[in-house]
Amino acid sequence: MKPSSSNSRSKGHAKARRKTREELDQEARDRKRQKKRRGHAPGSRAAGGNTTSGSKGQNAPKDPRIGSKTPIPLGVIEKVTKQHKPKSEKPMLSPQAELELLETDERLDALLERLEAGETLSAEEQSWVDAKLDRIDELMQKLGLSYDDDEEEEEDEKQEDMMRLLRGN
C-alpha cells in the first residue's frame, strides 16, 4: 500500500483562515454592487416583467396592448357597396321541354307507382311529388293541354258512334 500523500492535519477540523483587510474590502465592494442591483429593472412595468433578452419574439407571450399593423384611412372615404352577383340560374327551358323532363322523371314515376300500389310516402317525398304534379299542371295549362282532352275525345267518339247507330248509317 502506498502511503497517503495528504497530511494528517487535513483529516481533522481545519482552522478558519483569517482574511486580510484587502479581501474584506473587496467582498464589501461586491456586496454593495449587488445591493445596488436589487429590485426591478428600469422600465419593467411597461415592458411586462420577465422577458429574456435572447428570445425576443420567440415563444414569448404576445402583449395584448400591441394592436394590428393594418393601416387605417384618416380621411373620409365613401364606402363602396359590392353588388351581389346572382348565382348562375338554371337555364330556362321551354315549357314543352320542361314538361317532357317532368313526364320522363324516373323518381316521380317510381313514387307515383308506389302511391298507386297503396304505399304511404314520407312527408318529404309526398311534398316533392305534390310540387312536381303542380308544376306539370301549370305547364299543361300554359301549353293549352289537359288530362281531360283524351277522355273528352273518347266520349266524343262514343257519342258520334251512337249518333251513327241511331241514324242507321
UniProtKB/Swiss-Prot annotation:
Biased composition annotated in UniProt, kind: Acidic residues: 147-159
Keywords: GTPase activation, Ribosome biogenesis
UniProt function note: A GTPase-activating protein (GAP) that modifies Der/EngA GTPase function. May play a role in ribosome biogenesis.
UniProt biased composition (Polar residues): 49-58
Primary gene name: yihI
Origin: domain of life: Bacteria
The keyword Nucleus belongs to this UniProt entry's keyword annotation: no
Keyword Metal-binding: no
Start-end of Basic residues biased regions: 10-19, 31-40
Disulphide bridges: none
Protein name: Der GTPase-activating protein YihI
Source organism phylogeny: Bacteria, Pseudomonadati, Pseudomonadota, Gammaproteobacteria, Enterobacterales
Pfam family, one: YihI
